[in-house]
Amino acid sequence: DWHLDMQLTGKVVLSAAALLLVTVAYRLYKSRPAPAQRWGGNAQAEAKEEAQGSGQPAVQEASPGVLLTGPRRRRSSKGAEAPQGCSCENPRGPYVLVTGATSTDRKSQRKGSGEERGGQSSDSEQVPPCCRGQETRTAVSGNPDPPHLPRLGSEPNSSPAGLIAAADGSCAGGELSPPQDSKPPEHPGLGQLEPPHCHHPAPLQGSSDMNQSWVFTRVIGVNREEAGALEAASDVGLTLHQQEGAPNASYTFSSIARVRMEENFIQKVEGVEPRLKGKVYDYYVESTSQAIFQGRLAPRTAALTEVPSPRPPPRSLGTGAASGGQAGDTKGAAERAASPQPGPSPSTRGFSRKESLLQIAENPELQLQPDGFWLPAPPCPDPGALPGSGRSSQEPHVQLVAGTNFFHIPLTSASAPQVHLDLGNCYEVLTLAKRQNLEALKEAAYKVMSENYLQVLRSPDIYGCLSGAERELILQRRLQGRQYLVVADVSPKEDSGGLCCYDDELDVWRPLARLPPEAVSRGCAICSLFNYLFVVSGCQGPGHQPSSRVFCYNPLTGIWSEVCPLNQARPHCRLVALDGHLYAIGGECLNSVERYDPRLDRWDFAPPLPNDTFALAHTATACAKEIFVTGGSLRFLLFRFSAQEQRWWAGPAGGSKDRTAEMVAVNGFLYRFDLNRSLGIAVYRCSASTRLWYECATYRTPYPDAFQCAVVDNLIYCVGRRSTLCFLADSVSPRFVPKELRSFPAPQGTLLPTVLTLPTPDLPQTRV
């Protein structure tokens, strides 16, 4: 809905520009010298001819003392339409202001005015009921000076400044009091002024709708001299429509700007043949836009919709439209129009354009509310008050951006972690934050995406719309932080298990999470990918049935989930992460390999191990974009798999005949740990490119326990049931750290180490 809000507020800017345009045109016209030729008694006839030449209908003929009615101007508001046979426009229409009349004409005008008033008052009783509103305005039109139009001076060359100042009054804000002197205008002329259409709703009993219209009108300049005429008007309308008890609201915005200028270059007409008399410039701009907002409105909206729905035809503000009486009461309407009126009553609903903008800015319910997220409201004694309604630096404000007004949502870095976001609206919120340049909101959207990276990766509506830099950004933010050694204690006998992390600074073990009962199995394998912990099941239940289920743990949210299962069960397999994929290698009596694509959430078969070799009790690691497999049933063999070429190579493993316990990769080197009952632990190293093995370190201990390894930076942790060793994988002098670390507390089953990046305890998490 942001483009609807831009259209709505853009009309206000258009109206302001129209006002400036017509003001400059009026000043330029006034600076031109006017001819001294005065028009005689044929002024009305020439006015008709000029109106016909310019495409405008001629004004109606009436007595000189009565303001003549002419063609009705189109109205931009479409909220209410009049029924057939009853005009909903202002019956006064364009007014004809005549200048340069003689004293004899003035007397006849006064006399004709009185006769006309008498005729109108007597005929007002016979008006059909469908035009009662028009009858009231016709009776009032007998008054020489309408309530909302000033009376011109008695001098023919009087300045129009007084007229402009009087016409500049707020037509929608109230009624202007008529002058005490009720004399008719003494200088009839040919200048035409279209009065602003003041839409003021009349109360309607039994209506279930609540409508309200505001029209902000400003007459820029009205002037008529002997050689030309200038008229300019600008209307701005805002209509609010809301069904009673319904959450939807409709806003209709209309803007009209019109400038008309007449020029006459012929000072003296010779002959009766038709000739060029002058030029007519007519500029007319009308625009209408409508916006419908869905959602609940705050109680403060009732202050704007307390007026009942308007009843067509709407009455002019000068005839007492705010009164609750009948529109057909001609006598009462005439008395109200003729008597001096005080200031606008409190019940009169009138606003200027500035007040309307300020009211929209102070009422967030009238602004564009992004769906799907909310901002927490500060503690406030008034439960009906909305956040941002107070006078502070955080209140909504209007900013001019590329010529259009936008309402900014206040958001600070402190409130960013409290923003309610989810995967359904995070991309829309990110788009809004980019458009409004809200850094805190943008960071919050990136945070949600990084914390739920797998879900974002599988959603084409989110991940497919992100740029390459944004995809890398949310992944790197997920991997930012401190890496910890995480060990899974899997005890199939007790059908329980848990995760613990090791703090090397304090040399303590801390519990992290519990394993779900479905993930506890014998011969399972674990691995980390994108800072997620994946667990591939082994054999479950009392009968040790092989299972193909795969589970996933998100350490940033603490949520366990189940992903796509394997195509076949693989107890005692090895799980390796390479190039954003998981590889399940071997298993009991298996030489096949499966690859998991996290974006598609699917397992596919990869090229099997060469020579139909079964891999059991083996070890595997990834180094230099290749997978290396050795140990167990693959004694004296080293298999190498290229993910780019999708093929395996077999080669000699080298080293001794001792049993290989583990093999890991650090900084382009492979480290293999062999166990010897009498000598202890021997470490062999080779480069991934040269594949030349040599012994680099030893750890002398009799009867060493079996262990498994995990790499944190350049430290290799060897985690066993009774001890935990640390090996420094230095490129020059690799060695064991002399200090023995604290062992895993009370192990219940098999210990499976891995590495995860964990959030700090004081870091607030976004609610998902």
UniProtKB/Swiss-Prot annotation:
Lipid bilayer topology: Single-pass membrane protein
Keywords assigned: Glycoprotein, Kelch repeat, Membrane, Phosphoprotein, Repeat, Transmembrane, Transmembrane helix
Pfam family, one: Kelch_1
One CC-aspect GO term: membrane
Listed InterPro entries: Kelch-typ_b-propeller (IPR015915), Kelch/BTB_domain_protein (IPR052310), Kelch_1 (IPR006652)
Chain segments annotated as transmembrane: 12-29
Region (Disordered): 35-210, 304-352, 371-395
Phosphoserine PTM sites in chain numbering: 77, 356
Kelch repeat locations: 319-365, 483-529, 532-580, 581-623, 626-668
Record localization: Membrane
Record flagged with keyword Protein biosynthesis: no
SUPFAM superfamilies on file: Kelch motif (SSF117281)
Compositionally biased tracts (Basic and acidic residues): 104-118
Glycosylation site residues: 248
Main localization category: membrane
PANTHER family, per database record: BTB_2 DOMAIN-CONTAINING PROTEIN, KELCH DOMAIN-CONTAINING PROTEIN 7A
Protein name: Kelch domain-containing protein 7A
Species assigned in the record: Pongo abelii
Gene: KLHDC7A
